[in-house]
């Protein structure tokens, strides 16, 4: 059974005793019912992880760290999921599963047909919430590098950013298909539309910005399904689901 894993955002130092963040200690003691002497795994997002032992709990929680272990669970394929805002708790689900499926970043975008509208403090709080979901997904899935959930951008603002690698935009009926593409030579970004799909103007804007339109089969997928299906397909073709590391 895997030892409980916790993210500690402060840089961890090998072979020493550290103060645990209170939120980590609360989860360990109150939720998981761990006790002094129990083994845990700590990671700081800088790569690798530490086998550690709880040495004190309560108001001044401590853990004794061993050496940094060079363990990584990252895919050779660097995929950013560019997800149009979706209503309800769909974004929570998408962020969690995207991290489990190996995305290196999640970029929320406000689309013309997005039901969810966020701005100002509400937007900042929601992004912080999604970032915590990404942290929890790393703790659960064994990843030691936490994907960044970006601030909410308009589609136009996102497309104006310098493109790093290939950008794919999913839309039903597109002529392009993943299986006919050559293996990418760098990072990938996959753009997923909202509940009502991308508008014609958005598709035109994306294509002018160099995005390649693709369809995932003959069926219309829900927004919370499409990105995860795309991530799974990409990891199977060229990532760590393929058993190959040629990317």
Predicted regions and their residues:
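N-terminal positively charged helical leader segments and presequences
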Residues: 1-70, 121
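Short, ordered loop/turn segments at secondary-structure junctions
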Residues: 11, 68, 110-114, 218-219
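Glycine/charged-rich beta-loop-alpha catalytic/anionic-binding loops adjacent to active sites
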Residues: 18-20, 76-80, 186-189, 208-216
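Residue-level signal for inorganic ion chemistry
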Residues: 37, 98, 134, 206, ...
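Generic structural signal for residues in well-ordered beta-strands
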Residues: 40, 63, 146-150, 213
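RNA substrate-binding interface of SAM-dependent RNA methyltransferases
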Residues: 72-168
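Active-site/ligand-binding-proximal alpha/beta "capping" segment
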Residues: 162-203, 212-215
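Structured adenosyl-cofactor binding patch, chiefly the S-adenosyl-L-methionine
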Residues: 200-247
């Amino acid at each position: 059974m895997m030892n409980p894993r916790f993210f500690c955002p402060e840089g961890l130092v090998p072979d020493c005793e550290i103060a645990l963040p209170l939120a980590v200690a609360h989860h360990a003691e109150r939720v998981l019912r761990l006790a002094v002497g129990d083994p845990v795994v700590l990671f700081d997002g800088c790569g690798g992880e530490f086998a550690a032992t709880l040495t004190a709990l309560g108001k001044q929680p401590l853990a004794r760290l061993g050496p940094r272990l060079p363990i990584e669970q990252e895919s050779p394929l660097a995929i950013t999921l560019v997800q149009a805002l979706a209503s309800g708790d769909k974004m929570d689900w998408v962020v969690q599963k995207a991290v489990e499926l190996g995305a290196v970043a999640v970029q929320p975008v406000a689309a013309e047909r997005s039901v969810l509208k966020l701005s100002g403090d509400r937007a900042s709080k929601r992004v912080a919430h999604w970032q915590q979901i990404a942290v929890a997904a790393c703790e659960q899935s064994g990843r030691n590098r936490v994907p960044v959930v970006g601030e909410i951008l308009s589609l136009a603002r996102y497309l104006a950013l310098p493109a790093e690698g290939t950008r794919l935009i999913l839309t039903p009926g597109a002529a392009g298909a993943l299986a006919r593409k050559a293996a990418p030579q760098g990072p990938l970004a996959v753009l997923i539309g909202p509940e009502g799909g991308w508008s014609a103007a958005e598709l035109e804007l994306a294509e002018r910005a160099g995005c390649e339109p693709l369809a995932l089969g003959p069926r219309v997928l829900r927004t919370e399904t499409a990105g995860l299906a795309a991530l799974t397909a990409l990891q199977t073709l060229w990532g760590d689901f393929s058993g190959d590391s040629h990317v």
